[in-house]
Structure formats: C-alpha cells, structure tokens
Amino acid sequence: MDYEALLDRIMRTVDAEAYLPLADVVPAEHKAALDEIGQALQGAHFDPAALRARVIQLQKLGQLDRVAMYSALHVIAAHPRVNNLEEAAAMAAQQEMAALEEGGPRLQANLASVERHRGVIAFMKGHTDLALDYFSRAFERQRAAGNLANVLACLLRLGDQAEARDLLRQVRGAFPAELTAALDDMIHKDPDLALLRTETPA
C-alpha cells in the first residue's frame, strides 16, 4: 500500500473555505423515512422482507428518491443478520445508475454513498486494502467524518496503527473543528476505532 499517495489524496481535499459537511447529512425530505428505516434496522427482531417492502413503499410515496431507496436496500442486504452481499452489490450498482440518471447538485454526494457501500462489501469480504481505496474515494467526493472514520478503520484492520495515528494527527491540524469533533465522537463510540482513543480528547 502506497501510504504517501493515500495521505496525499486525502490531504489534497483539505480546503477549509470550501468545506461542505455532506456525508453525515441527508436531504430534509428523506430524513423521516431514513430515520424510520434506521430504527427498524437496530431493532432486535427486524424482518428483512417487511423492511424491504416498506422501503419500496416509502419511495412510491415520494418520501425517498430512487438513489436513497437503493442505498437503503443495500444496507438491509449487508446487515449482519441478512449478509446477502451479492444483493448488496447489486443494490449499489442500481444506486449508481440512479445517481447518474438523477445528476444534479447531489451527484457527488450520491456517488460517495455508492463508494462507501462498495467499501463495506470489500471490508466484509476481507479485502481491506480494496475497501480502503473505496473509502478514500468516498472521502475525496464528500469531505465528512464518516468517510474518514472508514479510512481509519481500514488502516487499523490492516495493522497499520502508525499510519492511522499519523493521518489522524494531520487531519486534526488541517480540517475544520466540526469535522474533527464529529470524528472524535465516532472514535469514542466505534469499537473498530478503539485503538485511536488515546489520540482523542477525553
């Protein structure tokens, strides 16, 4: 892995004047529907088939667009209790086509979501280096804490703690405070990032 190239790709996206906190924000018109889906996914006994049907219904009701629908269907398929990664990959491909057809001002954000979903599949299949590339591309498209957290998790999974700590220190010195605060919060909550907790404020 060419870490210098990886760090360069990430750090080249730094521009505090142009910072747009997109990745962890959803369009207002989708928020209620996505909150409902998120709560169902966290339930102890969620029914994948019923939730898929509900997602499709929400799209027909106009509460989700096609991009968000396919994204949600991917998340259901990739859920550990479902673990249908072929379906998850198919939904990511459909999401990409829907994003390209829709275009518009959210195109980069929508494509970043596709990159994240593909990164999740690669990560779950044990291809951590490939997942790292997907997550890095997601961050290039959409500068937000969630995308950086995925990059750091991959570095840690690969055993590259020094590189992860170096990246975190560089990010802390270059990125807007709201992004680093959100990233610190994720580090304290996500067990995949636990090895970085000594690098964050208490």
PLM regions and their residue ranges:
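Start-of-helix signal in alpha-solenoid helical-repeat scaffolds, especially tetratricopeptide repeats
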Residues: Y3, H30, P48, D65-S71, ...
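Hydrophobic/aromatic side-chain positions at a characteristic register within alpha-helices
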Residues: V14, L41, Q59, P80-R81, ...
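TPR-repeat structural position
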Residues: A16-Y19, H45-P48, L85-E86, T128, ...
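Conserved positions within tetratricopeptide repeat
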Residues: L20-A23, P48-R52, A68, A89-A90, ...
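Flexible helix-coil transition and linker loops at the boundaries of alpha-helical arrays
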Residues: P21-V25, P48, V55-A68, N83, ...
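"A position-specific structural signal for the A-helix of alpha-solenoid helical repeats
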Residues: K31, D35-G38, A53, Y70-V75, ...
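Alpha-helical adaptor scaffolds
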Residues: Y70-E140, G146, R157, Q170-G173
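TPR/TPR-like (Sel1-like) alpha-helical repeat modules
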Residues: L152-L179
